[in-house]
UniProtKB/Swiss-Prot annotation:
It comes from Staphylococcus aureus (strain NCTC 8325 / PS 47). This is Lipoyl synthase. Binds 2 [4Fe-4S] clusters per subunit. One cluster is coordinated with 3 cysteines and an exchangeable S-adenosyl-L-methionine. Residues 283-298 have a biased composition (Basic and acidic residues). Its EC number is 2.8.1.8. SUPFAM superfamilies: Radical SAM enzymes. It comes from the Bacteria.
Length: 305
């Protein structure tokens, strides 16, 4: 946690973005409030929200409430005692995806360690409801590790998302400090078991940089992900949400991100997005497999007919 006396690194120019609050963005924000829905785009203060909502027709819904049972030191999502589950949430999410005419939707969730099934049944039902109402929209899920409950993971994977995304976030050495309620190896096992359950569904993970890791540790994390058959990798700059969160140790340059992407592709990832403003869901619509891309093309054709 940064104190008033600690030096805060000055944000470089390449992290300064121009906000584009066009009609799509404004309309989506209004609808979210009307439907009483949460998005991680807003809760986690994502820098790409205007591009995704405004231009790419993608959005990331955060289900199972807006309060997380964990308190990861990098994350801006509220923590504390969550509310009861809203059993109508799956239908509202599905309806909103339809009204927004989304090309790709990411469904993430707060960690619900207070629930016996970690929220997996409502999560899976949300995927099914979205699929029923939006057959041409590709669906990516971004769950917590569900406390290592692999029955919950099986429930989730049985809903057949187009991508399973679970973020390792940082290197092994820093994991206890960055996300104390998770473990590095449990994340790897979660990803491995996801692929074993549904081998044709691409798996994906994300690394934040700038927390004090070394380049060698980043490469080791890439190797660990590939050893567990992860297909897609995103790498982005950690940005400190508030003074209460971990402070930034280093700002990586766009050139350094380019080098990281090249190394990732050389290591065998099928797709890698790497850049200062890249987040886990950034350009996620481009990362689905060919079968899912065909679904998107059919949706575009129907939209333009």
């Amino acid at each position: 946690m940064a104190t008033k006396n600690e030096e805060i690194l000055r944000k470089p120019d390449w992290l300064k973005i121009k906000l584009n609050t066009n009609e799509n963005y404004t309309g989506l924000k209004k609808m979210m409030r009307e439907k009483n829905l949460n998005t991680v785009c807003e809760e986690a203060k994502c820098p790409n929200i205007h591009e995704c909502w405004g231009a790419r027709r993608t959005a990331t819904f955060m289900i199972l409430g807006a309060v997380c049972t964990r308190a990861c030191r990098f994350c801006a999502v509220k923590t504390g005692l969550p509310n009861e589950l809203d059993l109508n949430e799956p239908e509202r999410v599905a309806e909103s995806v339809e009204l927004m005419n989304l090309k790709h939707v990411v469904i993430t969730a707060v960690a619900r360690d207070d629930l016996r099934d970690a929220g997996s049944n409502v999560y899976a039902e949300t995927v099914r409801k979205v699929r029923e109402r939006n057959p041409f929209t590709t669906i990516e899920i971004l769950p917590s590790d569900m406390g290592g409950d692999y029955d919950a993971l099986e429930t989730l994977m049985a809903s057949r998302p187009d991508i399973l995304n679970h973020n390792i976030e940082t290197v092994r050495r820093l994991t206890p400090r960055v996300r104390a309620r998770a473990t590095y190896d449990r994340t790897l096992e979660f990803l491995r078991r996801s692929k074993e359950l549904q081998p044709d569904i691409p798996t994906k993970s994300s690394i934040m940089v700038g927390l004090g890791e070394t380049i060698e540790e980043i490469y080791e994390t890439m190797d660990d992900l590939r050893a567990n058959d992860v297909d897609i990798l995103t790498i982005g700059q950690y940005l400190q949400p508030s003074r209460k969160h971990l402070k930034v140790q280093k700002y990586y340059t766009p050139l350094e991100f380019g080098k990281l992407r090249k190394v990732a592709m050389d290591k065998g990832f099928k797709h890698c997005q790497a850049g200062p403003l890249v987040r886990s869901s950034y350009h996620a619509d481009e990362q689905v497999n060919e079968a899912a891309k065909e679904k998107q093309r059919q949706g575009e054709a129907q939209l333009n007919s």
